[in-house]
């Protein structure tokens, strides 16, 4: 396990910073973490122990904005693209840029009008000559809510789910690779509207993203097939196969955070003294009510950590090995 706590980026008191300064710090920390672990394409695709070790780094509960960037970037964007590298090796330079966080990957699936029913998304990619026209047909089809602004000096690229339309026929939903912004500005036809900050969380530049007749080359389609699936729902689940793993990753910093809380609570309970019946102060850890709370947190953190690591081993064993890489 790496010791990132000694790095100056994690020694800053972010509570004294402005919202935008905190967001910028989260991006800088995410880049530091990813470069420190130096993950390969195979690590991401095959869920190696090194891949899960990054998610379980005890530094991540200190900045959930940083973890949010990493979780979506690696699990959803890089993981989705990596599946198609054997058929589209021209994407390898992009994936290497993503793994170095020189470029941030964004996963645009759900829409303002389609969250849990994302199978029914409305964004379209209409076949046009040697490419596609990506378009948001109405406000409810705006992609919600990954961070897509150029405000923090990092280029962003997205995997965008859209319905393929060929000669007026709906061929089902597929992922397209779409440049979102440079380090300074949005690409033509792409609009990002930043959402208000959510209270009680690490801030990020969460946004609503829409497309106005954006031309995409044929190579933007991940997988390349224009055929309509025989089973549209099964095909859709196959497209979004990384989501269950991404959902599992979200629990990692929460369990590390529980262990942090248990340690802090135990140390405080040993240090804090009060007078009870006699003149000599005693630590509040001597009270059964305090012992129960601390020991419960220690037990829960330990058991969940063992359980989570066993699930990690299952994902590694069940993944497809990549002998070509």
What feature does the model see in each segment?
Residues 118-120, 153-155, 170-171, 204-206:
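Short, solvent-exposed loop/turn segments at the edges of secondary structure
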Residues 133-191:
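A short core secondary-structure module
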Residues 102-109, 190-193:
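Short Pro/Gly-enriched beta-strand edge/turn motifs at strand-loop
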Residues 1-104, 115-116, 127-133, 316-321:
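Amphipathic, small/basic residue-rich leader segments at the start of a protein or domain
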